[in-house]
């Protein structure tokens, strides 16, 4: 199936998509999940930086641990495990959790901390294109979600630090000399977390 990434991004932002003369409205909640093969890229093209910036977070899965691999094999001995999937939440409940998560308080010192971190990415000598304001907003949203998942109604500096790399690594466009020195986006961001002072008092 051929998928127009621009159309998916448009649908994500504008809540509708057009196909020929028809317009389809999407219902909330709506999320776009994409996979990327770390090895083969024949016949594919990298997403433009502007479209990568629309994805809130990128996770690197790697291989599952030994026990998980055994469970994968065990679960597929008889039936397809997908037949055992059950609904655990309604769309309405999920939307309410999203609303509650975004109502979590984030104090000004933390907003300034996020801004200092993202500005530092733009000034880094190994970075050609740093984290955008949209990326900074994504850091705030993810930090609030983490605080909510930990049962708090306020964000702590460790919430920001915990999500910073996963939210920002795919948004960095590194200079060629970064590849020469074998420096990754995660390396750059890890260094900035050590260099940029976190707020002492919230």
Task: Show the residue positions of the predicted features.
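Hydrophobic aliphatic residues
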Residues: 14, 51, 73-77, 118, ...
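Conserved RecA-like P-loop NTPase ATPase core
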Residues: 1, 35, 55, 114, ...
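C-terminal engagement/docking regions of AAA+ P-loop ATPases
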Residues: 123-202
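Conserved AAA+ ATPase small/helical "lid" subdomain
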Residues: 84-139
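Non-catalytic accessory segments flanking P-loop/AAA+ NTPase cores
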Residues: 63-67, 71-74, 81-84, 102-106, ...
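Canonical AAA+ ATPase core
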Residues: 18-104, 144-146
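N-terminal low-complexity segments that are often proline-rich with Ser/Thr-Pro
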Residues: 1-17
């Amino acid at each position: 199936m051929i998928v127009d990434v621009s159309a998916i991004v448009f649908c994500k932002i504008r809540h509708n998509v057009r196909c020929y003369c028809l317009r389809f409205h999407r219902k909330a909640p709506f999320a776009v999940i994409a996979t990327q093969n770390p090895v083969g890229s024949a016949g594919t093209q990298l997403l433009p930086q502007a479209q990568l910036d629309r994805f809130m977070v990128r996770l690197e899965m790697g291989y599952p641990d030994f026990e998980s691999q055994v469970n994968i094999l065990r679960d597929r001995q008889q039936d397809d495990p997908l037949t055992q999937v059950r609904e655990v939440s309604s769309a309405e409940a999920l939307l309410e959790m999203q609303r509650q998560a975004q109502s979590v308080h984030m104090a000004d010192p933390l907003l300034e901390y996020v801004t200092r971190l993202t500005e530092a990415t733009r000034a880094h000598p190994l970075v050609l294109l740093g984290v955008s304001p949209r990326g900074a907003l994504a850091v705030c949203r993810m930090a609030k979600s983490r605080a909510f998942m930990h049962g708090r109604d306020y964000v702590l500096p460790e919430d920001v630090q915990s999500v910073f790399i996963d939210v920002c690594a795919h948004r960095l466009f590194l200079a060629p000399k970064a590849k020469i020195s074998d420096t990754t986006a995660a390396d750059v961001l890890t260094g900035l977390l050590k260099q940029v002072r976190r707020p002492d008092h919230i």
